[in-house]
């Protein structure tokens, strides 16, 4: 079962699997809420155009195609989490939540219940079974510019055992060439960049439309606790933000922390964004069956952030402490931190808090 978004990547994944001899079924997930019109754009993974494109590709490949309704689950597991995170002063990653709960959670469970051996997606990452370790491993895709392993750190061993990632050994250029060779109409289709369920305006407008009564103004404080002004509500701010603060201090200032207990936005100088230590919750580990006492890793604190050398320490309750060799700028609670050793994904978690040392 191939999760088809109507884009070139998942379409090419379906084509490659059929060519390899698999019996392929294409599915598109209906995710947009009933009270929200489907995204109108050309590239959104949930848009009506996406469904049309996926169906056309399935017809060309001569594979069965279905649209599956995951609206209610998506609203509970992704949209509600997205809104709640911003209200709590965190910056969420809805794509990771969707991968964890929807694609490789509910969709995989449905496929297995139907007797289907694997689900497949168009992610740029590699997975294989390592006999020496007795584990399935996950690694970056060959195309460093398109690598999506960061968004896949939540894989369990059971999920990896029943997942195929056909594009891991290809570059984006090669994928488009393969799609063109198959005569797929999406071979030159632009990529989707937006949050799929935010159909109008930006994410702030979306949160306001769905949780206006929960957004409360509060104080803007400096790092010493002095009141500098008023903010419009925590969801309107994120770590590292400089514009839109409404302050005239005669010097640049940045959001350095969000304090939900005091409903406060904390601002400071650029140097105040630098931190060497983070704490992460809800960690998942792919490379390790048993956790070491500590380990050297490289870590990525945002999807497109460069990796940085660090020492990882396990903590109780699925938490971890990560100490970077050099200070990192704008480490943001709510975002994922993903640990690597070479090309291999060690695992990752959700950034909970930061510290200086």
From Swiss-Prot:
Top-level taxon: Bacteria
One GO BP annotation of this record: tRNA wobble position uridine thiolation
Cell compartments where the protein resides: Cytoplasm
- Site feature Interaction with tRNA, where: 123, 335
Cellular component, GO annotation:
cytoplasm
- What are the disulphide bonds in this sequence? 98-196
Provide the catalytic activity annotation: S-sulfanyl-L-cysteinyl-[protein] + uridine(34) in tRNA + AH2 + ATP = 2-thiouridine(34) in tRNA + L-cysteinyl-[protein] + A + AMP + diphosphate + H(+)
Give the EC number.
2.8.1.13
Q: Which Pfam families match?
A: tRNA_Me_trans (PF03054), tRNA_Me_trans_C (PF20258), tRNA_Me_trans_M (PF20259)
Q: Where is this region: Interaction with tRNA?
A: 146-148, 302-303
Q: Which UniProt keywords apply?
A: ATP-binding, Cytoplasm, Disulfide bond, Nucleotide-binding, RNA-binding, Transferase, tRNA processing, tRNA-binding
Q: Which residues bind ATP?
A: 3-10, 29, 122
Q: Give the principal location in a single coarse category.
A: cytoplasm
Q: Which SUPFAM superfamilies match?
A: Adenine nucleotide alpha hydrolases-like
- Active site residues according to the UniProt entry: 98, 196
The Gene Ontology terms for molecular function here are:
ATP binding; tRNA binding; tRNA-uridine 2-sulfurtransferase activity
Q: Does this UniProt record's set of keywords contain Aminoacyl-tRNA synthetase?
A: no
What is the annotated role of this protein in its UniProt record? Catalyzes the 2-thiolation of uridine at the wobble position (U34) of tRNA, leading to the formation of s(2)U34.
Give the family, as the similarity comment puts it.
Belongs to the MnmA/TRMU family.
Name this polypeptide is given: tRNA-specific 2-thiouridylase MnmA
Q: Which organism is it from?
A: Moorella thermoacetica (strain ATCC 39073 / JCM 9320)
Taxonomic lineage is: Bacteria, Bacillati, Bacillota, Clostridia, Moorellales
- The gene is mnmA
């Amino acid at each position: 079962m191939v999760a088809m978004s109507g884009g070139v990547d998942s379409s090419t994944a379906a084509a490659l699997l059929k060519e390899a001899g698999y019996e392929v079924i294409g599915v598109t997930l209906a995710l947009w809420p009933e009270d929200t019109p489907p995204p109108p754009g050309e590239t959104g993974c949930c848009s009506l155009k996406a469904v049309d494109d996926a169906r056309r590709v399935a017809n060309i490949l001569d594979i069965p195609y279905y649209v599956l309704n995951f609206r209610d689950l998506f609203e509970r597991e992704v949209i509600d989490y997205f809104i709640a995170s911003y209200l709590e002063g965190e910056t969420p990653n809805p794509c990771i939540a969707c991968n964890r709960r929807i694609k490789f959670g509910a969709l995989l469970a449905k496929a297995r219940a139907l007797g289907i051996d694997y689900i497949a997606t168009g992610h740029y990452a590699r997975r294989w079974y390592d006999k020496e370790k007795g584990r399935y491993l996950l690694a970056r895709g060959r195309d460093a510019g398109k690598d999506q392993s960061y968004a896949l750190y939540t894989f369990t061993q059971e999920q990896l055992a029943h997942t195929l990632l056909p594009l891991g050994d290809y570059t984006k250029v090669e994928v488009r060439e393969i799609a063109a060779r198959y005569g797929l109409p999406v071979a030159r289709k632009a990529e989707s960049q937006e949050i799929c369920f935010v159909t109008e305006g930006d994410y702030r407008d979306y949160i306001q439309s769905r949780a206006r009564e929960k957004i409360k103004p509060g104080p803007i404080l400096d790092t010493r606790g002095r009141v500098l002004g008023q903010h419009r509500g925590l969801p309107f701010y994120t770590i590292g933000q400089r514009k839109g603060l409404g302050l005239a201090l005669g010097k640049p200032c940045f959001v350095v922390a969000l304090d939900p207990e005091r409903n406060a936005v904390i601002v400071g100088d650029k140097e105040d964004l630098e931190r060497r230590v983070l704490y992460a919750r809800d960690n998942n580990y792919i490379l390790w069956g048993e956790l070491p006492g500590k380990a050297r890793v490289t870590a990525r604190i945002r999807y497109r952030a460069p990796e940085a050398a660090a020492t990882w320490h396990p903590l109780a309750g699925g938490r971890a402490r990560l100490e970077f060799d050099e200070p990192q700028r704008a480490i943001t609670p709510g975002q994922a931190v993903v640990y690597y050793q070479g090309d291999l994904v060690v695992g990752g978690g959700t950034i909970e808090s930061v510290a200086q040392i």
